[in-house]
Design a protein with these regions (language model features):
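Membrane-interfacial, low-structure loops and terminal tails that flank and connect transmembrane helices
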Residues: 1-3
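A structural signal for multi-pass alpha-helical bundles of membrane permease subunits
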Residues: 5-295
Length: 295
């Protein structure tokens, strides 16, 4: 009996049937919004009325907008500070990677920030920084110093928000490093110890190379976290004081939602998307080269 079409092509068609729902979902909820945002960025539009074609006008305005310049500088500051998370997490991970009951209990406490919502983190640190009843000013009073309205100071507010953001970021990187430390090659470490490797030499030449995958992922997620920073800015300062803490993601939302400038907000979203795309492409190329043994 001659096989029907399905029997003859089952191995080829089965993957198509399984992938089609995911492809449709991706097209509707990812690709369509991306191209819609790109199209809207060429218009001046309040989200309700007629759309006025302005071409690259929004991008030219962005180039000359001081608030966008401030947002970019703040994103760079976030990036620099977030790159402190991997080394701090590594140092903390080495300290916590001990077979002591007290350390095991402390380890669970360090995981806590990772599971806390960013909204909760923002509220906790807002209360902590409060100049009237916050713990920060209680410590300053014990030291004989004047109260400090950290989030109201345009020179210090960024650092206050970044410190709050680093709390869960360090916890996430810590999990990566503890996983990497648990998977270290014990035989290699023992061989190096027999050969006389100790202290810094042991760490730099034996332990750190084995933690390379964890370090790579920690750096990648830290950079992405810095570029996508929005929630804590929105919760703690709303971009203030006087726009000094705004970042690209927050500026995008403020222009599109609060100022009713959908086109300008879409232009900001497009630029942020391109920056993230370039970085993600670099990341994927690095992963591919690493798998091929070219790194």
């Amino acid at each position: 009996m001659q096989a029907n079409f399905w029997d003859r092509n089952q191995l080829k068609l089965a993957p198509v049937f399984f992938l089609t729902p995911a492809i449709l979902f991706f097209a509707v909820y990812v690709l369509h919004p991306i191209f819609s945002s790109l199209w809207i960025s060429f218009f001046e539009w309040d989200g309700v009325g007629d759309m006025l074609w302005v071409g690259f006008g929004n991008y030219i305005e962005m180039w000359e907008d001081d608030r966008v310049h401030t947002a970019i500088r703040n994103n760079v500051l976030w990036l620099i500070c977030f790159l402190l998370a991997p080394p701090l997490s590594l140092a903390l991970g080495i300290f916590l990677n001990q077979e002591l009951s007290e350390i095991k209990f402390a380890k669970s406490l360090f995981f806590f920030p990772f599971v806390v919502s960013p909204v909760v983190v923002g509220l906790i640190f807002s209360w902590f920084y409060n100049p009237k009843y916050g713990l920060l000013d209680s410590f300053l009073e014990l030291l004989g110093m004047q109260p400090l309205a950290l989030l109201s100071d345009e020179n210090l507010a960024n650092f206050g928000i970044i410190a709050a953001a680093l709390w869960p970021q360090i916890a996430y990187c810590l999990i990566l490093y503890l996983t990497g430390l648990a998977a270290l090659n014990k035989e290699m470490i023992e061989s190096a110890r027999i050969d006389g490797a100790r202290g810094w030499s042991m760490f730099w030449n034996i332990i750190l190379p084995q933690l390379r995958p964890a370090t790579f992922i920690a750096v990648v997620v830290s950079v992405l976290g810095a570029l996508r920073s929005f929630d804590l800015v929105a919760i703690m300062t709303q971009g203030g004081p006087w726009g000094s803490t705004t970042v690209l993601a927050y500026e995008m939302v403020e222009q599109a939602i609060f100022n009713y400038r959908m086109g300008y907000g879409a232009a900001l979203a497009t630029i942020l998307f391109l920056i993230l795309d370039i970085y993600i492409a670099w990341f994927l190329i690095r992963v591919w080269l690493n798998e091929k043994g070219r790194l």
